[in-house]
C-alpha cells in the first residue's frame, strides 16, 4: 500500500504544477519587453522599445532589456558577461547587444545574450497589410486575434474588421457541397465534419481540430461572425434606380452627379445653359413652321374631292 500524501506534500505538488504552468504560458505579444511602449527622452514621441529613437536617433537614458525587461542590473554575483562586483549598473553599462529582429537592447547577462536571438518573438514580424517590418516603422507590433498574423499599429483595426471574410461565395466545404461546420481563419476556408479530419491522425478531445491545410486551429463556423466574399460584375449604379427605369443614362448622369461628375438628369450636357435655351427656341420656331405646312397640305387634299363633286353636278 502506498503511503498517504500529507497536506504539506499536496501543497508542494500543486505549487510545482502552478509554477510550471506560469513558466510555460504564452505571454501576449503586447506584454513582451521587446515590444514594450517607449517615449523618447529627447523628442518625446511614443514608439516601440528600441535601441535608438526611430525619429531622432537618440539613445534612451534607461534602456530596457528585450529578454528579461530589467532596467537596472542588480546582480552582485551572477552570469553577467561584464563583471561589476558590488556595484549596480544602469544605462549603457547594463546593455550587451542589439537584437537584429526587434531592434532593442539586450542586457549583458549571459542567459539573455544566448537565448534572445534564437527565441525573439519578432523574428518574422512583417505586417500582413502593409508588409513593413520592425525597422520600417516606429510603432509596436500586434497579432490578429483571428488569424494570429502580425500587424503594425496603423493597420491592426482595419485588418481585424475584415479578417472574418471567406474566400468563397458560400459556406460550403471546399471538397464537397456539404455545409462547412469548421472554418480556418488563416486559410479563409470552410470544412465539413468528414474533410476536416485527416486519416491516420489522432486528435485530442479537448483541443480544437487543426486545419488540414495549414495546421492552424479551426473554429466552429456558427460561433463566428463569418461573411462570404461577394463579386459584383458590370456597371454598378451609384445610389439610383435601375437602368430599366431610367434607360442607359442612369449610370452616367441620372439622380445627381454621375460617374463623370455631370449634373444632367438623363445624359450628357456639352454646351452651356444659354446655348441650350437658344437652341430650344430655334427648335420651337422650326416646329411651328412645319405645323403650318402640314395644315396647308391638309386643306389642299380636302379641296380636291370637293372640286370633283362640283364637276359631276354640272354635268
From Swiss-Prot:
It is found in: Nucleus; Nucleus, Nucleolus. It comes from the Eukaryota. GO terms for molecular function: zinc ion binding. One of its GO terms (biological process) is larval lymph gland hemopoiesis. A motif (Nuclear localization signal) lies at residues 3-11. Residues 304-315 have a biased composition (Basic and acidic residues). The keyword Zinc-finger applies. Residues 228-248, 263-315 are annotated as: Disordered. It holds the Pfam family NOA36. A zinc finger (C4-type) spans 40-56, 65-102, 127-147, 173-187. Residues 272-303 have a biased composition (Acidic residues). GO terms for cellular component: chromosome, centromeric region; midbody; nucleolus; nucleus. The keyword Cytoplasm does not apply. Keywords: Metal-binding, Nucleus, Repeat, Zinc, Zinc-finger. Its main location: nucleus. Belongs to the NOA36 family. This is Zinc finger protein 330 homolog. It comes from Drosophila melanogaster.
Amino acid at each position: 500500500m502506498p503511503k498517504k500524501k500529507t497536506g504539506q506534500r499536496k501543497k508542494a505538488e500543486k505549487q510545482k504544477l502552478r509554477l510550471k504552468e506560469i513558466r510555460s504560458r504564452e505571454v501576449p505579444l503586447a506584454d513582451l519587453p521587446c515590444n514594450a511602449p517607449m517615449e523618447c527622452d529627447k523628442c518625446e514621441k511614443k514608439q516601440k522599445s528600441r535601441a535608438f529613437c526611430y525619429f531622432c536617433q537618440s539613445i534612451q537614458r534607461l534602456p530596457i532589456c528585450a529578454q528579461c525587461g530589467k532596467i537596472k542590473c542588480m546582480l552582485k554575483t551572477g552570469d553577467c558577461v561584464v563583471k561589476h562586483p558590488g556595484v549596480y549598473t544602469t544605462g549603457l553599462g547594463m546593455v550587451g547587444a542589439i537584437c537584429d529582429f526587434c531592434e532593442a537592447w539586450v542586457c549583458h547577462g549571459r542567459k539573455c545574450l544566448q537565448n534572445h536571438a534564437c527565441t525573439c518573438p519578432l523574428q518574422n514580424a512583417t505586417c500582413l497589410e502593409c508588409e513593413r517590418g520592425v525597422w520600417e516603422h516606429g510603432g509596436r507590433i500586434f497579432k490578429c486575434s483571428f488569424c494570429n498574423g502580425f500587424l503594425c499599429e496603423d493597420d491592426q483595426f482595419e485588418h481585424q474588421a475584415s479578417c472574418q471574410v471567406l474566400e468563397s461565395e458560400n459556406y460550403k466545404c471546399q471538397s464537397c457541397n456539404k455545409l462547412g461546420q469548421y472554418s480556418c481563419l488563416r486559410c479563409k476556408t470552410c470544412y465539413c465534419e468528414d474533410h476536416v479530419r485527416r486519416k491516420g491522425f489522432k486528435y485530442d478531445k479537448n483541443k480544437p481540430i487543426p486545419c488540414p491545410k495549414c495546421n492552424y486551429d479551426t473554429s466552429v463556423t456558427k460561433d463566428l461572425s463569418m461573411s462570404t466574399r461577394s463579386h459584383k460584375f458590370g456597371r454598378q449604379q451609384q445610389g439610383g434606380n435601375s437602368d430599366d427605369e431610367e434607360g442607359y443614362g442612369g449610370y452616367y448622369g441620372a439622380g445627381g452627379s454621375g460617374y463623370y461628375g455631370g449634373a444632367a438628369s438623363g445624359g450628357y450636357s456639352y454646351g452651356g445653359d444659354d446655348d441650350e435655351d437658344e437652341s430650344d427656341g430655334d427648335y420651337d420656331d422650326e416646329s411651328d413652321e412645319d405645323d403650318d405646312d402640314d395644315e396647308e397640305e391638309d386643306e389642299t387634299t380636302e379641296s380636291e374631292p370637293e372640286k370633283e363633286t362640283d364637276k359631276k353636278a354640272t354635268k
